[in-house]
Amino acid sequence: MRALAVDLGGSHATCALVEDRTIIRAKTLATEGSVGLGPILPSLAAALCTVMQEAETGASQCAGLAFCFCGLVDHAQAKVISTNAKYDDAPRLDLKGWCEKSLGVPFAIENDARMALLGESYAGAARGFDDVVMVTLGTGIGGVAMIQGRLLRGKHSQAGCLGGHFPVLFDGRQCTCGAIGCAEAEAAGWSLPEVCRTTRGFASSSLAKDPITFERLFGYAEEGDPVPVEVRERRLAVWAALTVGLIHAYDPEVVIFGGGVMKSASMILPYLQSYANRHAWTPWGKVTVRCAELGSRAGLLGAIPLLQGRAAS
């Protein structure tokens, strides 16, 4: 089975042709979330046509287009419900109509975190598990749950996909969503520079010399610089508290962590596993904490199960 897939991020979009558990062809375009989704739809359609041509595949050979979107999505109605400072015109767009007119294939859309979990369940670290929570650590924090082999969506399509907005500190930092002390506000990539700059001793630390990233944070912490060490330990504590909260909320067999931060998985995973073992209330046994396997391919590889309806709520 072949399918088209679009994975839309804040700064780029990947358009691909997938077959079963393999990406046959892919083309990545630069985008700008602040500009909106409408202006780039022609470019997305053109890129999808290009990957089909390169693979000598016609639209009639594709099961449809699976669209991976960075916002709240009503999968059943095939539309975007709400955004957060990226592609804010999306709720007003008829994406299904655009797809049918431009490509002539069926259309399905899902939240990016859910699509990543579908991919990991189909071809990666969640394969063989029916009850899974996945957390993506990057610019933001994505969270999604699968219960008894079915994606958790809820009455308003919000269930399970707002893990980054679990409150972890009642008097913490202001989040972009408007709440206080969300996991994102305390330990996501977008909040990291401010967290570092407001830490005592920052001006004389290694972090003051370069643009602040998680990769540099963990690197300088390994060298023993006290400011990066302090910030790193606080990030780990937030992620660990979030892990336990998600375990208590969704009763998974396994919690999977993905995203660019997991380049430091050899240090992060043992911390999270140890914390979960000590603090999660799971009398039946221990929840496994593991690293995602598919990286940036996860959302694209979620196309086949999404179009087949394998994980419908």
Give names to the regions the model predicted.
Residues 2-46, 60, 79-82, 151, ...:
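Short glycine-rich, Thr/Ser-proximal phosphate-binding strand/loop in the N-terminal lobe
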Residues 3-7, 62-66, 132-136, 176, ...:
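Short glycine-aspartate micro-motif
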Residues 13, 23, 180-256:
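A mobile "lid/hinge" subdomain adjacent to the ATP/sugar-phosphate binding pocket shared
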Residues 18, 110-121, 262-313:
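Glycine-rich phosphate-binding/hydrolytic loop that grips phosphoryl groups
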Residues 33, 37-45, 61-65, 71-133, ...:
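Glycine-rich phosphate-binding loop and adjoining helix at the ATP-binding site
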Residues 44-65, 106-107, 125, 202-206, ...:
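Phosphate/pyrophosphate-binding loops at sites that engage ATP/ADP/AMP, CoA/4′-phosphopantetheine
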Residues 129-186:
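Glycine-rich phosphate-binding loop of actin/hexokinase-like ATP-binding domains
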